[in-house]
């Protein structure tokens, strides 16, 4: 009896292995030709060195990675419990494998395999999908729009001179930063845990983006507030992005000093 392999049976879904990486990188290059080419170092920086771990699920055809669903986890304090929120990134299907499968297609099947493997590990999965992916996500994966993000822009004002103390640049995060975050988090329902490992990975040792971490100090030298400015986040002359802000809600005078240019 002659047996043929159906198109669906061609694919194996599993976690990424070390020997898959070259193929994964090549498929990513084909799927995102407008993006900067990611190399092995960039992959490990994004998905292996993350102190919260990694979530990489691939669809393999033969020895070739032809689809992928990936998320970057982040440890989050939710109430009194630490959980993981995951930012979905680098979800893709090789151009030569996007046709010929009935709905739900290879993208959805890869995502379903991802959630079968990792779904119970995380409290939230979120992202900013392109329009086509958003339609698929809402139809097959039960994604919902939480809100539309806005870009808030303002001019920096002059120093009010109302608060005492210094603003200095930090080059590393000590335990005092974590203690400041814990003070702030008491009033927040959910907040990324800003420990030294996270801040080092996210800001201080980022290989391709420049961040300036500013600390507001009290007159006795203790840490009162912190903000992070992204130098390369916004493509506009003279513009900078405020990418993190740690100031206790009941200490507005610290916020005034942190806003000083």
Language-model features: where?
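Alpha-helical membrane-targeting segments
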Residues: 139-164
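Tryptophan-centric aromatic hotspots in well-structured domains and transmembrane helices
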Residues: 43-47, 69-71, 128, 143-145, ...
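Short amphipathic alpha-helix that is part of the acyltransferase structural core
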Residues: 2-60, 65, 87, 160-197, ...
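Conserved beta-strand in the GNAT
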Residues: 56-58, 64-74, 87, 215, ...
